[in-house]
Amino acid sequence: MINLGAKQSTIVVAMSGGVDSSAVAAMLNEQGHNVIGITLQLYDHGMAVGKKNACCAGQDIYDAKMVANKLGIPHYVLDYESKFKESVIDNFVDSYLQGETPLPCVQCNKSVKFRDLIKTARELGADKLATGHYVRKINGDNGAELHTGLDPAKDQSYFLFTTTKEQLEYLRFPLGGLTKGETRKLASKFGLEVADKPDSQDICFIPDGNYKSVINKIRPNSSESGKIIHVNGFELGEHSGIINYTIGQRRGLGIAYNEPLYVVKIDPKDNIVYVGPESALNVQEFIIRDVNWLADEIKDNEKLEVAVKIRSTRPPRLAEISKLGDDKMKVKFLCKEKAVAPGQACVIYAGARVLGGGWITREIR
């Protein structure tokens, strides 16, 4: 059993209604801590897609309340819909309109789930905020460090790179050393009905996967057609709006050519989608912005060999990083990588430790 310390603490648990956060609440409650469950109502799905029972709404809120009742802990539902729309949904929509491939789960963790929820937890007098994320917090020589979860199949460190050092000191991740199977066994041991509840797979505010309908409802007339141009300079056809395309896309281009073509660049200013052969996707280096750095400071002229992830589903790749001012870095792969997409995150690792990360810009070569 994972113990967060012998001293009884007041701990807020972010309860989503799923098995992970429910198991965390049960574990901490059994250890004798004063546990307070908080569930965030983030989105009225009927506003955009007419779906119910998706993450952080409907059935999930009910499930979280039932778990809290079984454990005998206080439970509160906080209406964060306006915060969520401003910080996550609007950012998601605007990112697509800028020709990027957004990552809303990171934005949600950065703003609503950590910044705003930590503030609420402190106002409640809590000593810590615990979540069901599969990452580890390890106390190093210079303070708290963020490390990958021990189960590589469930590791969520990529989505938490924006966590600040100050936030990391306050946060607890009791599941970081467990597998999903072990978590489900714990939930069963505690008699929680959510023990076998399936994991949510979709973006919470787009449960049917149709992100275009959300964009069009929030930003009407955003799918303006434009040119599809080959990277060699000649026009191949017309696209149906840049929101329908992402870097590396091959299917659904609606053009015929004598070899397979991929989306290699999106120009939102001139409303152009550039396509080319697979080799045109190869990238040697790129710039990241809004860097959140969790390790020792890098000197201005220093180059550091690290591993980086540019998609949550891709393995880390060896690279060299260097500072460009206060909040930018240059990332140079040791071997070229395909389909580096603006708007996605680049997370930087040294072994299992998360050193930091930033957002991929259009400055790609």
Curated annotation (Swiss-Prot):
The active site is at C108 (nucleophile), C204 (cysteine persulfide intermediate). It holds the Pfam family tRNA_Me_trans. The record marks H133, Q344 as: Interaction with tRNA. GO terms for molecular function: ATP binding; tRNA binding; tRNA-uridine 2-sulfurtransferase activity. Its EC number is 2.8.1.13. It is an enzyme of class 2 (transferase). Keywords: ATP-binding, Cytoplasm, Disulfide bond, Nucleotide-binding, RNA-binding, Transferase, tRNA processing, tRNA-binding. ATP binds at A14, M15, S16, G17, G18, V19, D20, S21, L40, G132. GO terms for cellular component: cytoplasm. It is found in: Cytoplasm. InterPro entries: MnmA-like, MnmA-like_C, MnmA-like_central, MnmA-like_central_sf, Rossmann-like_a/b/a_fold. Disulfide bonds join C108-C204. The keyword Membrane does not apply. It catalyses: S-sulfanyl-L-cysteinyl-[protein] + uridine(34) in tRNA + AH2 + ATP = 2-thiouridine(34) in tRNA + L-cysteinyl-[protein] + A + AMP + diphosphate + H(+). One of its GO terms (biological process) is tRNA wobble position uridine thiolation. Residues 154-156 are annotated as: Interaction with tRNA. Catalyzes the 2-thiolation of uridine at the wobble position (U34) of tRNA, leading to the formation of s(2)U34. NCBIfam families: PRK00143.1, trmU. Belongs to the MnmA/TRMU family. This is tRNA-specific 2-thiouridylase MnmA. It comes from Rickettsia rickettsii (strain Sheila Smith).
